[in-house]
Regions:
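Short, low-structural-confidence N-terminal segments
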Residues: 1-67, 178-255
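Solvent-exposed aromatic/hydrophobic patches embedded in short alpha-helical segments
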Residues: 67-85, 89, 96, 101-109, ...
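Short, low-complexity, polybasic intrinsically disordered segments
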Residues: 111-113
């Protein structure tokens, strides 16, 4: 990351210089960053609560584990992305947060999340809000890919991969989508992905083997993997471009 460097230690304005913090040191500055002409300071409390509850890092003496450089960097990068989302005019509604939570976490109950992940209810809500915001930024910059990981076909009860059924044929045709011509019972284009995969292994709409279904599965998975990799690379390039514009200072951490 351009502009990144580790600063000197010390408390107060200079930040944290020990592995543990007392209660009154939680609001000490542990890092600062400049992005788009704006300078922001980060306190130990903010860095810790970006991933944990204070109680989680509190020891038996009433002190708190100082946030690591990795935790702080993660927090700063997240803030830069959120700043970018704000610049793009991206916001999320309560309904969108609820949908995101249910899709990604399995529940939209913030109390349940708090208990499950060891954070406060307010933290859980904030994490969902930020994550949903970044998801919208991702879709805006990368695109909302329709690619989804395929589900493997059900193995035959007898373990014979040559076992044939209409279910396996339906499975293949469903994965192939528009590449299959249902009116003619064959491939629309001999040069299409699935047509090539089955060039020497024909099947009908009424019957296909488990082995053939697995061929379709591997084909679908390769397509999914390729699209996912492309999207990941595009997002990484975008995010790194933002990070390169930031100057980040971390002050004397030893956690």
């Amino acid at each position: 990351m351009v502009g990144f460097f580790i600063g000197n230690g010390g408390f107060g304005g200079k930040g944290v210089g020990s592995a543990t913090l007392t209660e009154d040191q939680l609001d000490s500055t542990v890092a600062s960053y400049s992005y788009n002409g704006k300078k922001s300071d980060i306190t130990a409390r903010e860095a810790i609560e970006s991933q944990y509850s204070l109680d989680t890092v509190k020891d038996s003496d009433g002190n708190y584990t100082a946030p690591s450089a990795d935790v702080i960097l993660s927090y700063v990068r997240n803030q830069i992305l959120l700043d970018a989302a704000e610049d793009e005019g991206i916001t999320v509604s309560s309904k969108e947060m609820k949908q995101y939570a249910e899709d990604s976490i399995g529940t939209s109950d913030y109390k349940t999340m708090a208990t499950q992940y060891g954070v406060s209810k307010d933290q859980a809500k904030q994490i969902v809000r930020q994550s949903a915001t970044l998801q919208k930024l991702y879709k805006k910059k990368v695109g909302d890919s329709s690619a989804s990981m395929p589900t493997a076909p059900t193995e035959p009860a007898d373990g014979n991969e040559e076992t044939a059924s209409k279910d396996y044929a339906d499975y293949i045709i469903n994965l192939a989508g528009d590449e299959w011509d249902s009116s003619k019972g064959t491939w629309k284009d001999a040069d299409s992905t699935y047509a090539k995969a089955f060039a020497d292994d024909a099947f009908t709409a009424d019957s296909a083997t488990y082995k053939q279904a697995m061929t379709a599965y591997y084909t679908a998975y390769q397509q999914y993997s390729s699209q996912a990799s492309s999207a990941s690379s595009k997002w990484t390039e975008y995010a790194n471009g933002l990070y390169a514009k930031a100057n980040i200072s971390i002050y004397g951490l030893f956690a």
